[in-house]
Amino acid sequence: MDVKVLRLGHRPSRDARITTHVCLTARAFGASEVILSGEEDPKLMEGVEDVVRRWGGPFSVVYRRNWQGVIDSWKKDGGEVIHLTMYGLPARDVVPGIMDNGKDKLIVVGGARVPGKVYSLADYNVGVTNQPHSEVSSLAVFMHMLLDGAEFDLKFEDARIEVIPQARGKMLREIDDGD
């Protein structure tokens, strides 16, 4: 199952930090790609690509102006669309039915104002709680549930550095090509 994330309504002047965190969370939890819509942001995309160069992949970030075209194409190719929204059905009730159905997933996370059409285009409108909170936290919790905790065992290809877990302190290890 391939998982990609569509970030709606990105605004470089206001959303650079939160969209970067959407990208980092998507990557760390096992998505293969984030698709940005809204305004194009080459600086953000270069920053995420730098993380992938250092910490490994595979992962990419691309820009598509037409978010509806992304959704339509995804559905035409047999994938399903999951919109994370506080107005959706509880994740704990919805995720078991979609996690093992074999379909690729496009997870849609909003920006400032989500177009109403997203709610009708989505196969599932899912609430990670029905309270206001961050799209980053929604994405992390949802992906953890969807992939049944698999993010804890992910290995990233071509990583140049990795964390050596410690009870106290911080330790990184540089990875040689021969490792």
UniProtKB/Swiss-Prot annotation:
Specifically catalyzes the AdoMet-dependent 2'-O-ribose methylation of cytidine at position 56 in tRNAs. CDD domains: aTrm56-like. It catalyses: cytidine(56) in tRNA + S-adenosyl-L-methionine = 2'-O-methylcytidine(56) in tRNA + S-adenosyl-L-homocysteine + H(+). Keywords: Cytoplasm, Methyltransferase, S-adenosyl-L-methionine, Transferase, tRNA processing. It is found in: Cytoplasm. Its main location: cytoplasm. It comes from the Archaea. Pfam families: Trm56 (PF01994). Belongs to the aTrm56 family. Homodimer. S-adenosyl-L-methionine binds at residue 84. It is an enzyme of class 2 (transferase). Signal peptide: none annotated. GO terms for molecular function: tRNA (cytidine(56)-2'-O)-methyltransferase activity. GO terms for cellular component: cytoplasm. This is tRNA (cytidine(56)-2'-O)-methyltransferase. InterPro entries: Alpha/beta_knot_MTases, tRNA_m1G_MTases_N, tRNA_mtfrase_aTrm56. HAMAP family: tRNA_methyltr_aTrm56 (MF_00077). The keyword Oxidoreductase does not apply. Its EC number is 2.1.1.206. GO terms for biological process: tRNA nucleoside ribose methylation.
